[in-house]
Amino acid sequence: LAYKLSITPGIERLTEVCLENSRINADLYKELDIKRGLRDINGAGVRAGLTKISTINSFKMVDGVKTPCEGELYYRGIDIHELTDGFIGEKRFGFEEMTYLLLYGKLPTEVELTDFIKELAHQRALPRNFVRDVIMKAPSKDMMNTLARSVLTLYSYDSLADDISLSNVMRQCLNLIAVFPMLSVYGYHAHNHYNNGKSLYIHHPEKSLSTAENILRLLRPDKKYTSIEATVLDLALVLHMEHGGGNNSTFTTHVVTSSGTDTYSAIAAALGSLKGPKHGGANIKVMGMFEDLKKNVKDLKDEEEVGLYLRKLLHKEAFDKKGLIYGMGHAVYSISDPRANIFKGYVERLAESKGNDADYALYSMVERLAPKIIGEERHIYKGVSANIDFYSGLVYHMLGLPPELYTPIFACARITGWSAHRLEELINTDKIIRPAYVSVQDTKPYVLMKDRS
């Protein structure tokens, strides 16, 4: 049971003092040319490093003018469309193959892929009694905290935990990639049993199955799943596994890795970043928004009525009153998110197999209406499109994944990208990342205790 903590009047007073003395005039950021959020005035990220792991394009030069274009994403120089068409067309699961590509910079041969899958299967094991002693003993209501705690605890079981030689970090990364699904699903089962009073069941992973298949097998009481379910989950993992070095959690991995710390600490820091709702929780917000839409719109097939609800969202009159249509727009992409474009067709197939055609039709309507409405209400004409998280929550819902696991499943995918970037940082950089902060605090004299007010 959680022990009770409360915000006392004393803490409230201390908070007021902190606010009074810590606010910074927003005009100073512009005056001193400070890149807030490490972005320039147009929202583009400042150049903080080099990478070969992935490439993101959202603009092209046309007659010397920077012009928005259809979004492009490349893993190790290969277009994501070609990659997904390749492994799906050849009837393979893609997560393991794309993990090999991102870590090692080349597509594996058939023999190399077979050996790599065997290596991941070998690594898919936790220390003896780890589930009982670590995961079950202190279940948390938040699976990201459970996941981070489990990762940090694995440090204690590793006799070479602080060895940051490339081969040892490779071993650690492969192990974490392999066990993340187990840590996530087992953490949920512990929470669901001890906090929600539900039945507890722990299934062991099957070595012959893919990562996506094992996630579904571990999660479900009967261990059963369909081919389309596994295919769509595998695709979701592939599309979430890497997105450049500048996203918050991957940049966190670079920053913490540059200090020379161990792999477990670096990945736990990345998990802390991904837990933040501004980074990893977008699909949950999308699901909540659609639930609110269904409650407040009488005819879900009426474009005018749905459009009116979307305008209310933008005017802070609906859902969480934040003025956002969740799942629309992206920090990098404007005209289109290539991941969403790839995902959409498979989401439709899954919806058909589940009898969720009406939900899919509603999502498609919102995706079609929202850009025009956002343009009209916000006077944004550079282009706004659905991002990958617009559909991922619906997919996880149709797969029967509980909302508590939405962000951990994201982590099960992105651990590959974090690992690739940690290795790249170790290989290429020997300087600790240390950006500058400009002090805007006026100097003042020391005041004796008896003279303070």
What residue spans do the PLM features occupy?
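Non-transmembrane, aqueous-exposed alpha-helical and coiled segments at domain scale
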Residues: A2-S453
